């Protein structure tokens, strides 16, 4: 199944305006990958920003902030990209083969590991959730997030999940999606 059909499923579930843009020229091993991603955002989403936000977009130490919608950026050794949505969200992409059992054991409870469809889903799910939620709690760490309520949407080759935490967080939509493409795992978590 194509990545486009997986995105259509996410659009129909949460946000028709959701966009995912990835490119292997934006992988983390490319020296200017971060600038290239932001250039693409600027070229294709200019209308979403006011003048000051456009100027800040070129500051690699700032997260992109738009007047109209939200962006999230991710990259790994094979590709990089960004997402856009009307809803606050976090995006992560990882090479499946690089997610180790050790990292899962350090960041996920035994109960989470037993419930997850694939152990590697826990890492990208928590990363996507952390990106979406960390701006509301400065003391938030990955281990504070618990991935729950896994569902398989096999006809779309997508899994969904929700997050819980012992810390008080504003979850709102609280809907995450994970899918794979080649050796890459993608997560989009809507706060």
Would you name each region that the model predicts?
Residues 1-191:
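Core catalytic alpha/beta fold that binds nucleotide/phospho-ligands
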């Amino acid at each position: 199944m194509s990545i486009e059909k997986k995105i259509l499923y996410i659009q129909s579930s949460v946000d028709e305006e959701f966009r995912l843009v990835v490119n292997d020229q934006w992988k983390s091993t490319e020296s200017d990958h971060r600038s290239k991603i932001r250039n693409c955002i600027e070229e294709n989403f200019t209308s979403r920003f006011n003048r000051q936000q456009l100027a800040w977009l070129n500051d690699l130490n700032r997260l992109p902030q738009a007047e109209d919608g939200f962006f999230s950026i991710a990259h790994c050794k094979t590709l990089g990209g960004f997402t856009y949505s009307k809803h606050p969200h976090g995006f992560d992409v990882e090479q499946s083969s690089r997610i180790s059992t050790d990292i899962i054991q350090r960041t996920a409870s035994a109960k989470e590991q037993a419930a997850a469809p694939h152990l590697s889903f826990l890492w990208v799910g928590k990363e996507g959730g952390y990106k979406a939620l960390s701006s509301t709690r400065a003391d938030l760490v990955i281990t504070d997030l618990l991935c729950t309520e896994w569902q398989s949407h096999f006809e779309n080759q997508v899994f969904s999940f929700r997050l819980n935490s012992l810390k008080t967080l504003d979850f709102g939509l609280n809907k995450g999606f994970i899918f794979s493409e080649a050796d890459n795992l993608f997560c989009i978590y809507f706060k």
